[in-house]
Amino acid sequence: NIIATVDLNGQQIDGSTNDVLNLGDIKNKFTAFGWEVIECVDGNNICEIKDRLESAKMKCFKDKPVCILLKTVMGNGVDFMMHTHEWHGKAPNDEQLEIGLSQNEETLGDY
């Protein structure tokens, strides 16, 4: 079967999803189309994501495809990138990159 992930960070390239193109209740939409939905309350937490993926793997062999809704904070961990759409599709300059990396000591390699 199939596992889909949806990043729900509340941002689009032109602003918040509520202001630009409100998608409504994504969970209800996937459910209406016959998907099993698993919610990940802290989609910025690697351990929680791994747990939800394991749950999805166990469920995806049943009758329904599985969707994991990841509630994330865009730019999480970098003070000047968090909670704004302005970094959607924009690369930091060298100075901003250095600052951002210094604010996030953990990497995927730590897991």
Protein language model regions, located:
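Glycine-rich ThDP/TPP pyrophosphate-binding loop and its adjacent helix/strand module
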Residues: N1-Y111
